[in-house]
Structures are given as C-alpha cells and as structure tokens.
Amino acid sequence: EFPALGYRLDYKGRSVVISGDTRPTKNMVKFAAGADVLIHEVHVGLDGSERGGVRPVRGAHHTSPREAGEIFAETKPKLAVYTHIVWGRKSEQDLIDLTRDTYSGPLVVGQEMMQIEIGDKVKVLK
C-alpha cells in the first residue's frame, strides 16, 4: 500500500487543492470540497479506455477520467485542472470528453508553466 498525499492551500479566502497519485478517496472529496481550484492527476489506459492495458498496481493508484469527474462534481471547484496525466493514445479533447460523462463544470488540461489567477473569478492566464 502506498500513501497518497495531497495538499490544500488556503490564503485570504481562496483555496487550491492538489492531489497526488491517488485512486478516488473520501478524503480527497472532504478536503477538496469548495476549493476554488482542484488540480487532480488522471490516468487513461494504454488502449485509450478507462483501464485497458494498465498494470494492476498502476491502475490501483490512479484515477480515471470518469472517476475524476465524479470527484469534481462532488467538490464543485470553480476550475478543475488535470495534471500528472498518464495516458495512452488519446488527445486532450478525448480526455475531456471522457470526463464529461460525469462532470459538466469548468475543466482544463494543465500545461507546463500554466498560470491560474484566483480572485472573484478563476481564469487561466497561460
């Protein structure tokens, strides 16, 4: 069993939650509830399906797009961001589409050096 570490940063009424490698857990939902931004890892199987071609140990410690969508839907961040993306041959749009099965809110796929401004509104500056 590997520990799953995540972080919640609260400052002047704003909050950011960053998951580590994790399967879906009640603790993630508990600590991410109401965050302005939830940055979460995601894993897509090597064949582009939810878990296809994934070694059991890897699949057991990551979250699928649909599972992440469920977490986003339950915690209701102003912006959901994917990071530490482990995926097969899918495009970013495919990743978003898989997530849309369970989450319809604001979602972006994180990029190197992406900047996010958190105020009354949350916006990606790039």
How does the language model describe each region?
Residues V109-K126:
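Binuclear metal-dependent phosphoesterase catalytic core
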Residues S19:
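Short hydrophobic beta-strand that contains or immediately precedes a catalytic carboxylate
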